[in-house]
Amino acid sequence: MKSLLVILSILLISGLCARATTEQEKTFVEKYKTALETNDTTTLQSCLYTTGADPMIVGFYKMMQSNGEGDKVSKIELEELTLDDVKKATAPQDGPSGKVCLNLKPTKKLVIVTEKKDENGSSTNTTENFIAEKDGKFVIPVPGPCK
């Protein structure tokens, strides 16, 4: 009987933890989507994890975030990393001041599809950002010098 109670307790706790993570993901995605659509640069930039990051790359990330501000977000979701994503995330990349690496290990990727319509027609754009967790919060890690 005691072992049955222990097993049920473990299942209940792990179910609650999974639900909390799902709620955390939904909250992050909604916050990011709202910030994109309302040109909220402060919120967008608060999602960047810049500790140890290359300052030129931080500037580039900020510019890229503001590049699509105000566009209609037609799809935004956190996805699991594929094997190719993991390989790409862990490999050193060429940066403005040498080889750079992500300063946090990504756990997911944020996929954003935006639509833009104007007098010249319409277009869609898809962007992907690696997402990591730091202090219980989802962040976009900005690359810095490899260690």
Q: Residue spans of the language-model regions?
A:
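Sec-dependent N-terminal signal peptides
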Residues: L4-S14
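Short, low-complexity N-terminal intrinsically disordered segments enriched in polar/charged residues
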Residues: L16-T38, S46
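Short, exposed beta-strand/loop patches in secreted or surface proteins that constitute
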Residues: L36, V100-N103, F130-A132
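Short, well-ordered alpha-helical segments enriched in acidic and aromatic residues
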Residues: D40-V58
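A mature extracytoplasmic/lumenal domain signature
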Residues: L48-T51, E80-T82, K116, G144-C146
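Surface-exposed, charged secondary-structure patches
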Residues: K62-T124
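Short beta-strand edge/turn micro-motifs at domain boundaries
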Residues: K116-K147
